[in-house]
Amino acid sequence: MKFTRTLVLASTSLLATVATSQAQEVKRDTKKQGEVVLKPITIISHGKDNIEATGGTVLTYKDIEKLQPANVSELFSRQSSIAVSGGGGPSKRIHVLGMEQSNLAVSVDGVPQTATSWHHTGSNVIDPAFLKRVEVEAGAAAADSGFGAAAGAIRYETVNALDLLEPGKTFGARIIGSYGTNGRGFSGSTAAYGLKDGFDWLLMLHGTSGHNYKNGDGTEILGTEPAARNILGKAGYEFDGNRIDIGYERSRDKADRLIKMNMGLPGDTEYPLEVARDSVNIKYTRTDATDMWDPEVQFYYNRNDYWRNDYQNRTNGNMILKEDLYGGKLQNTFTIDYGKITAGIDFGKHDYNTDNYGHNDRRYRKFNTQQVGAFTQGRFEFDNGFSLSTGARYDYSRFADWNDEVFSDSGASVNGTLSYKFNEHIEVFAGASRTWLGYVLGDYGYVHARNNAFYTDPTFSPGRARNYKAGVNFGGADWSAGITLFDTRIAGLPNYDSQKLGNDPEEYRSRGFTLNARYIWNYTTIGATFTKAKVTAGDDPVLPNSGSFMPIGDMATLFIDQEIPDYNMKVGATLAWAGRISDEAATAANFYDQPAYTVVNAYAEWNPPAVKNMTLRVGVENLFNENYYERTSFAPSQNRGGIDAVWAPGRTFTFQTAFKF
């Protein structure tokens, strides 16, 4: 497509090569109005990994405020390396470089999250209304990122009272209301927060109510109505150099959905479905940490439920899944001359409960996994231009299946990333990791559809992963550019055939490169990203069947933000493009070619001078009403009498008013 060549060549010729820094934080010099300076490029900064400098993604609170995302598709709309499939909220699946997020260590406020339970549901995600920061560490993840980081890590961080309070105030509140066309309906968010005598607290509520949306051709897409009912509560207390944080998150989505939310089947109808998530955590840290004593202690409990218990034909769709995940982490960070070393232990137990259908006398199944690990990660900056992030962990994993058969094993993981900075403008880096994954259960929802004789293969073994990356960063006071090459391989994943749970014999692989760039001039920011990835199972391209590994081909984004201080206004736009995908393996499996698409989103925001605490915003998604399905969606095919994609929304306007007190 001509647009592809134009976008890539324009980005390359403008900036020579593209940046790893997808969302560089910007600091304005208050002495010189309008002057903007980007952070220096380096993989290590003040003892912390710079995720962006090695091809990852960081979304700051300012980035999220600009986007005002209604869902995770909009949250990652400016990142070509991250694809989100369409449909209603519970059906959205997040893929990083073509790998579903269950292949990464996902956490919310440091709390590990459960993997995707069923291949027809979406990824477990946090409500974007609660977020203040997102980090996506693609590829070789640090040892303290958590257990099972096969393809990297995703870290979501939610807001607290200290983030929202105005300077000098001890109480605040925020109210946001919006209405959207094309089924988006009404959305409301309220928050109250305060600070008194070392105690800070926050309570935030968010709800949505709408209808099924229509695609670009005007066809109603069943099962897509917004129906979120979410709560975030936090409290913190500081005393004598100690800090204790307690958090609770509650998520509910209850609406009529398709029986298989990620695909359209002939004669599809909707059925009641409820997806629920509860998370509680408590964390201890020090506010007066020293070089040798900077502890962090955290304990957590997660509950995930999936209820579809009144489907008309029990042998084909009645389904109840329940998961409980609880554990903790104890670590300390040591500061030395050239950096920091973090060491600790983490542990967790994951309980699974499923109902069953079919001709068997076992109505329910229960099984579990357990993990205990020790880790250390060092991050160093040396005077000679070298920086190093390296670490290791050792884990014990245990799996007890539904027949009370027990499997146990242990293994080591190592990682390292080395960089050399020639000067303040050029840095090269290379990194690698080998990760032991323990017993991976993956898409355990298959167990729901197996008879009483289903068992675990006695040779079932732990999974493993390898990651390699290398690249170059360039940067100046107002621009950044770079390229990252990546290669991720994952093996030993589960295979639920008709008789037993065993290991998938295939090695899954994602390899390619990412290009990203950013230029800032006064109040204007322009950015671009490009990702090219080849995703395979063994020697063959993966099929576009909404699985854990999906073909993404070529994807690109281009965005611009403009502040207009004289009028208290901000405007911006995002263009997302995906190239056509056609391969013989998909054709042989009766899939149609995936067409290219180009989607444009835009927004305008205004703070009325007479009401300084009010913000008015209008946004439009899919400005030109493109009829498309998002990359990593289940692609149309001739199978089962004709499978259709869950098409993305057509043109949608959103009108928002926000008050902050």
Curated annotation (Swiss-Prot):
InterPro entries named in the record: Plug_dom, Plug_dom_sf, TonB-dep_rcpt-like, TonB-dep_rcpt_b-brl, TonB_rcpt_b-brl_sf
Which residues does UniProt assign to the signal peptide? Answer: 1-23
Q: Which UniProt keyword terms apply here?
A: Cell outer membrane, Membrane, Receptor, Signal, TonB box, Transmembrane, Transmembrane beta strand, Transport
Question: ATP-binding as a keyword?
Answer: no
Q: How does it sit in the membrane?
A: Multi-pass membrane protein
Induction remarks: Induced in absence of iron.
> Where is the TBDR beta-barrel domain positioned along the sequence?
170-661
Say which domain of life the source belongs to.
Bacteria
> SUPFAM superfamilies annotated for this entry?
Porins
Checking Pfam families in the record gives: Plug, TonB_dep_Rec_b-barrel
Recorded GO molecular functions are: siderophore uptake transmembrane transporter activity
TBDR plug domain boundaries: 48-159
The cellular component terms of Gene Ontology attached to this UniProt record, alphabetical and capped at eight, are: cell outer membrane
Q: Enumerate the subcellular locations listed in this protein's record, separating them with semicolons.
A: Cell outer membrane
UniProt function note? Heme transporter.
Question: Which family is this protein grouped under?
Answer: Belongs to the TonB-dependent receptor family.
Q: What is this protein called?
A: Heme transporter BhuA
Native organism is Brucella abortus biovar 1 (strain 9-941)
